[in-house]
Regions:
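Short glycine-enriched loops at secondary-structure junctions
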Residues: 38, 75-76, 127-128
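Non-catalytic DNA-recognition/assembly elements of restriction-modification systems
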Residues: 1-18, 141-182
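Sequence-specific dsDNA recognition surfaces
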Residues: 5-24, 36-68, 85
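A short glycine-rich beta-alpha junction/loop motif
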Residues: 2, 89-96, 127-156
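A generic structural signal for short beta-strands and their flanking turns/coil linkers
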Residues: 29, 47, 92-94
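A short beta-sheet element
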Residues: 34-35, 52-116, 135
Length: 182
């Protein structure tokens, strides 16, 4: 069994977030994610900043359920799946916003990138000697497997169930450690 592969640029819309420039930015102040807010598989929403966005920028830089947010610099490839954890969220320049087309289940593409990023498979695409970057042009050429949608859903469901078990165990361990300290 082999799956068709396609370049990311043919199976998803993606862009870098908006450049932070207080002198030029106009519009409504909205919360945005920066590189520091993206963790492996989750978001840290405890310290959100705001930037001005104009109406015509909302579609491009705004997040929708199922978007993958990936770090472009610092620790390129670090990513998480947006599930509308916060309303009217936007993205800043150091992040790629990846929105899969209908041929890809968002969770499947997320787990694909999580695997590629955590195992170092994206490293050959990085540029920069001191601070690494994953440029849009290189991201566009990544070959993405496109199995039948039912297979994508099954794979994502199994991996999500394991993630839930891991998170549940983390919470239990934290409770046990807290109880042991008392």
């Amino acid at each position: 069994m082999s799956w068709q592969t396609q370049k990311l640029e043919t199976v998803a819309d993606f862009c870098l977030g908006k450049m932070l420039d207080q002198n030029k930015n106009r519009g409504e102040p909205l919360p945005y994610l920066a590189n520091i807010n993206v963790r492996w598989g989750e978001f840290d929403l405890s310290d959100l900043r705001k930037m001005r966005f104009e109406q015509h920028e909302l579609e491009r830089y705004g997040l929708k359920y199922g978007d993958i947010v990936m770090c472009e610099g610092g620790e390129p490839g670090r990513c998480a799946l947006w599930k509308e954890q916060y309303s009217s969220m936007m993205v800043q320049k150091a992040l790629h916003r990846i929105r899969p087309h209908d041929c890809l289940w968002p969770e499947f593409l997320y787990y694909f990138f999580l695997f590629k990023g955590r195992t170092g498979h994206l490293a050959s695409l990085f540029t920069g000697s001191t601070i690494k970057h994953l440029p849009r042009e290189k991201l566009a050429l990544i070959e993405v497997p496109v199995p039948p949608q039912s297979t994508q859903i099954q794979i994502a469901s199994v991996l999500s169930a394991y993630d839930d078990l891991i998170e549940n165990n983390r919470r239990r361990m934290a409770l046990l450690e807290e109880a042991a300290r008392q």
